[in-house]
Amino acid sequence: MKVTLIHNPDAGGDNQPSGDDIVELIHKAGHSATLQSSKDVEWDKALEEPADIIAVAGGDGIVGQVAKRMIGKQIPIAILPMGTANNVATTLGVKHLAIDELIFGWTSARRVKFDVGNAKGPWGSIPFIEGLGMGLFTDTMSRLDAKDNIQLAHLSDTDEKLISVLQMLRSRVESCHSHEMNITFDDRDLSGKYILLEAMNIHYVGPNFCLAPPADPGDGLLDLVIASYDEREQIHQYLSDRIDNKSNYPGLMIHKGNHLRIECEGLTVHIDDDLWPEIGAPSPPNSIVIEVTVTSQALEMLAPA
């Protein structure tokens, strides 16, 4: 098979294979390969070349960038997880497999259909593959100060980075505020005051924050997770368990649907790993309206057989 490899050389720690190392493994598996660094200005032009597989070596950021450019095309995306959280890879069951095992398994891998969300708001219209949210997680990420970012940058171990972000989240749970949100999800009125809202296409958000364990990225539905002020203790306990490497879920209510409308005031929004407004930009307007829909099975991903 002909493989186009999009490689993020900055992803993960120092022990990750180089792009050339991965190409060598692809050749050993009997495939041809074209290597493209995601750091090149026009890296995405490589996606226009004929290929049987688009392989992505990196984290959720570059996986999302590639996926959004492959919407509606029938070429499967094969993830080689090398990032910090690897939320999409974890949902697909490929995170803990070795890079060579994944590559040698491509010929027998399952082709998994994958939905794409679409978020319309003051920013225009943006597709997403992980989710959209506001509240606790988004506020924490938008308020990371220079000291926090320096601390994370100096951690070469991905597990240490995850733990550090989980600790930052936990430290903000007790002081977080609830926000009034007018929410319509299909024909249901879910309006109320919430500390967290996440409309999810996969199981995880941010630092492997597993909010929607039943999420199926190919069912044509979003999993909407909302948490009230009274549910802070559940979230705090879940984060503590994750920091201690215990398997647990926060047990928040999950609603399923495919058309979400949110009206709120002055909140920062994350769409996958992008923030709106961007850090340093003017504060969001007093009132915003967000419409979220789903395009069912717009992508194909490879998963273990």
Pin down the residues of each PLM region:
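ATP/nucleoside-binding phosphotransfer catalytic cores, i.e., glycine-rich phosphate-binding loops
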Residues: 185-186, 191, 210-211, 216-305
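ATP/NTP phosphate-donor binding region
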Residues: 1-57, 64, 99-107
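Short N-terminal binding/cap micro-motifs at the start of the first secondary-structure element
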Residues: 12-16, 206-207, 299-301
